Amino acid sequence: MKNINPSQTSAWKALEQHFAQIKDIHLRELFEQDPDRFAKFSATFDDQILVDFSKNRITTETLKKLQALAKETDVAGAMRSLFSGEKINCTENRAVLHIALRNRSNTPMMVDGEDVMQQVNAVLAKMKDFSERVIHGEWKGYTGKGITDVVNIGIGGSDLGPYMVTEALKPYKNHLNMHFVSNVDGTHIAETLKALNPETTLFLIASKTFTTQETMTNAHSARDWFLKSAGDEGHIAKHFAALSTNGQEVKQFGIDTKNMFEFWDWVGGRYSLWSAIGLSIALSIGFENFEQLLSGAHAMDQHVANTPFEQNIPVLLALIGIWYNNFFGAETEAILPYDQYMHRFAAYFQQGNMESNGKYIDRNGHPVDYQTGPIIWGEPGTNGQHAFYQLIHQGTKLIPCDFIAPAISHNPLSDHHSKLLSNFFAQTEALAFGKSREQVDAEFATSGKTVVEVEHVAPFKVFEGNRPTNSILLREITPFSLGALIAMYEHKIFVQGAILNIFTFDQWGVELGKQLANRILPELKDDNRVVSHDSSTNGLINRFKAWR
C-alpha cells in the first residue's frame, strides 16, 4: 500500500473547490433537475440488495471528483495488497485475510508464501462436525444428557459479531438456547447462569490468547459454577470448548485440545465472526446456514475485487462518507435498521468502524490534518423515531444516515411490515425534502386557520430537509444477504482507511486503559489510602474504598 496524505492530493483540493460551489444546493433542486436521479444514483447487488444513494448531497461531478481521490490515493493498489495477503497491518506485521475465511471459491490465499486455505478448510470441517454433533444430541454432558444451552464467553470481536448475527438470524435458529457473556461485571455471568442447568450447558471460551482479562475472569467463574455441580474436573471437557490458539493455556484450564478451534493472527478480532469465533453462529443456525453466511460475504468480496469503482457499492459508500466527514464537517453517521432482528447491527459496526478508523496518526507516523473515522451509532426503527430523530430532522448537526430494511418480513403479522416500511420510506423522504414555510401555511389554511392565528407556531413546523441518507433495501434477511451486507460495510471501512492513509487493522487505542487497570487492580485489594495517581483518580479510588 502506498502512504499518501489525501489532503495534499490534487483531487482533495478539487473537492474543496467543488464543495464551495455546491454546499448550499438543496436535494429538492437536484431531484427537480434530474427526474432519473434514482436510476443514476443507485446500485443493486446480486438481486438481493438495493443501495439507493440518490438522497445524498452529491452530483455526477461530485462522484467523479471522489473517484479521482480514490485513484490518486491508490485504492486499487490497496485492494490488491489486501487480497494478496500482503502484511498491510504494518504496526503488528500481520496480513489481513478475513476474506480467506469465507473464500468459497477455494482459490489460493497466500500468507508468507503458504496457501492458508487448507488450514481454513480443516477448521471449518471441525466446526461442522462439532456443531452437528451438538445440534443432533450426539454430544452428551457429564450425566449423559444432550446440550440445551450454549454460552459464548468473549468480548469485543469475540462477542459483538456472533451476538449480532445470531440475533439477526433468529428465524433460522434451532432448539439450542444461545447466551452471550462479555462484561467483566459479575452481574453479566451471574444473571446468565441463574436459569441454566450445568448438566446441559456448553461453554465456548472465545479468546485468541486465552489470557484476555474479562473473558478469562468470566470463564473461571463459569468453571467454578459448573464444578459445584459436576465435581470432577474431568467433566470440564464435555462442557467447555475453546476458540483460541494457545493450546497450553487451554489444556491447563481443563479443556481437551481436541475441542480447541484455531484461528490465526491474520484474523482481526472485529473481523473474526467468519472464523472459529463464529462457532456459536453455527451452533445456533446450523452449519449449512453458516456456510451461506460465508457465501454471501464471499460474493461481496468478489463484487469489490472485480467491479469498476463507478459501480462498486462499498467504494461508493466509502467515498460519500468521506465527503460528509471531511467537507461538510459531519462528525457522526447513524445506522438505522428497520428490522428488530437487526437490533445489534449498529453496535457491531460501531466497533467495526470506530476501532478500525478511529486513528489520528497516519501510515507515515505523522498526525493527520483531516478527519478520519466518524462516530457510529443507531437503533432500530421505528423506536429511534420516538427517541432521537428530532435532532436528525431539526437539530443543528448534520447526521448522514443509513436506513436498512428487508422487503420481506420473517413475521408477516397483519399489516405490521407495511406500516414499518411506510415509515422507512417516509423518513428518508422527509429528511431529504423537508417541509417549507409555504407548505406549513398552506396546511393551516386548509384547516381553516389564518396566517396570523398560527404565526406563533408555524416556524417550529418547518423542516429544512437536505439531510442526506442512504437507503439499503434487502429482498429478505437471510444468511446469504446478511453475509453480503456485513462484508459491504467491512469493505467500506477498509476503503476509507486506505484513502485516509491510516492503519485500519490495529487498535492501539485500547491498550493504555488496560495497562493502567492492571496497575490499579492491586491497589484495590486493601483499604489503604491511595496517593499514587492524580488528585481526581486518587479521590475516586479512595471514595470507592470507603463506600464498598
Swiss-Prot record:
Where is the chain membrane-spanning?
Answer: none
Report the GO molecular function annotations: carbohydrate derivative binding; glucose-6-phosphate isomerase activity; monosaccharide binding
Record Gene3D superfamilies: 1.10.1390.10, Glucose-6-phosphate isomerase like protein, domain 1
Q: What class of enzyme is it?
A: isomerase
User: Which cysteines are disulphide-bonded?
Assistant: none
Which cell locations does it reside in? Answer: Cytoplasm
Its UniProt entry gives the catalysed reaction(s) as:
alpha-D-glucose 6-phosphate = beta-D-fructose 6-phosphate
Species whose genome carries this gene: Photorhabdus laumondii subsp. laumondii (strain DSM 15139 / CIP 105565 / TT01) (Photorhabdus luminescens subsp. laumondii)
Pathway entry: Carbohydrate biosynthesis; gluconeogenesis; Carbohydrate degradation; glycolysis; D-glyceraldehyde 3-phosphate and glycerone phosphate from D-glucose: step 2/4
Q: What does this protein do?
A: Catalyzes the reversible isomerization of glucose-6-phosphate to fructose-6-phosphate.
Give a GO biological-process term. Answer: gluconeogenesis
The name under which this protein is listed is: Glucose-6-phosphate isomerase
Recorded hits in InterPro entries, A to Z, give: G6P_Isomerase, G6P_Isomerase_C, Phosphoglucose_isomerase_CS, SIS_dom_sf, SIS_PGI_1, SIS_PGI_2
Q: Can you tell me which family this protein belongs to?
A: Belongs to the GPI family.
Known PANTHER family for this protein?
A: GLUCOSE-6-PHOSPHATE ISOMERASE
A Gene Ontology cellular-component term: cytosol
| The enzyme's E.C. designation | 5.3.1.9
Q: Which UniProt keywords apply?
A: Cytoplasm, Gluconeogenesis, Glycolysis, Isomerase
Has UniProt tagged this entry with the keyword Cell cycle? no
Query: Which residues are annotated as active site?
Result: E355 (proton donor), H386, K514
From which domain of life does this come? Bacteria
Family matches, as NCBIfam families: PRK00179.1
Q: What's the chief localization of this chain?
A: cytoplasm
